Amino acid sequence: MSNLITEITSEQLRTDHPDFRPGDTLSIHVKVVEGTRERIQVFEGVVIKRRGSGISETFTARKISYGVGVERTFPLHSPKIDKIEVKRYGKVRRAKLYYLRSLRGKKARIKEIRR
């Protein structure tokens, strides 16, 4: 039974996404439907967590919009995601960056590394 599930889901896995980790700053291009029109909306933020594996893998990105923190969770293999671009690679020592929620201003910065 599990072989059947992995066989079906392996066809739907996307391989066109770049390699990214928590702490990296991403630009996620999402297809948004408004009425009858479909457009691309860009969400740029820091990855604070990745969870799951296979077809059910998700990641959460956080950004500050007009002084308010906004977090959005995306399914990694969703057809609604047009493309993902890595803007900065961050150096962090945790897999889940929930502590960024309580930090403001310069304390919320993440050290950048060159890859």
Curated annotation (Swiss-Prot):
This protein's record includes keyword Mitochondrion: no
Name recorded for this polypeptide: Large ribosomal subunit protein bL19
Cystine pairings recorded for this chain: none
Keyword tags: Ribonucleoprotein, Ribosomal protein
Highest taxon of the lineage: Bacteria
Gene3D superfamilies hit by this protein: 2.30.30.790
PROSITE patterns in alphabetical order: RIBOSOMAL_L19
